[in-house]
Amino acid sequence: MLEGIRIIEIEGLGPGPFASMMLADLGADVIVVHRHSQPMPGMPERNIIDRGKRSIILNLKEEDDLTNLKKLLQTSDGLIEGFRPGVMERLGIGPEVVLKENPSLVYGRMTGWGQDGPKSKQAGHDLNYIGLSGALWYASPAGQAPFTPPTLVGDIGGGSLYLVAGMLAGLLNAQKTGKGTVVDAAIVDGSAHMMNLLMSTQDAGLLLSLIHI
């Protein structure tokens, strides 16, 4: 379904690579930029998440390699990166630079807390995001500490899936208008959004089967 769509993934952890894996599963041509200091691609922990992707090794602190990445981005439809806010800008490949050179590109950003806000510069983990968003409430028996669910809830549910939705919407918009966009996907925001139905149903007094009631 996404044949002919090229996505560049800057190697990272968890939600970003999982999102690009989903796009590759749908037919997109995903090229992973592996860091020069890391082992060669194909390590066991990445065998699944790198399925269907091509790869290239670049040192983004070297001018020649950075130039090669920019050339790739000029002929691509999308980019996915999961660095902390400001890192891509310091490398010289932030949205303003990249979208100036390729105005139709969809620039996907995967973070825990978003690009701005009081926690944007802080590290975080799945449990932090689902705790502050209210998603951990769902696994809270009355009078007991909440059970810790798998990291699928925040990282994948609130992160990867929302990034994929944003990327697909951005790609459709780019096809119609020729204009790219920045998709700012924050795990805490996605996790909170997933709770809309449960929270509203609980508020209406209709959710009577939660284990914490």
Report residues per predicted region.
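Acidic, glycine-rich segments within the central catalytic cores of soluble metabolic enzymes
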Residues: 132-211
